[in-house]
Amino acid sequence: MNIDQIQAILPHRYPFLLVDRVVEVAPGEKIKAYKNVTANEEFFNGHFPGNPVMPGVLIVEAMAQAVAILAMKSNGEVDMAGKVIYLAGVDNARFRKPVRPGDRLDIEGTVVKRKGPLWKLHAVATVDGEKVAEAELMATLAKK
């Protein structure tokens, strides 16, 4: 999925759209996506001057946006009019290595379980094949 297709699903826009491309999506199962982290990211101005590091909460947000795409695609195109996926919870978030300008943040998300409008998902973020973060995410489907 290119950026136009992503924007047709997610309500986020610059500077808060944190998924640049979806490489693979298997509805009801998994997603692979990425964010190109550039030196032009606004958050690097203050986090941290002279030692730029992507904030962990934004890594979690990037993972949440990727799994939101997975949930939306899993629910079916017809059912999505007027609906959005909201982040409902984050558990067991772990950050292993810093993400810096020039990195490509690869995200893999999998469905753990679904009950009605509530989704439990697992997401892992890597850079150059090394795990930088992971979390269990809860999401809920709701009206806009």
Per-region residue spans from a language model:
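Catalytic strand-loop segment that frames the active site of acyl-thioester-processing enzymes
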Residues: 14-54, 59
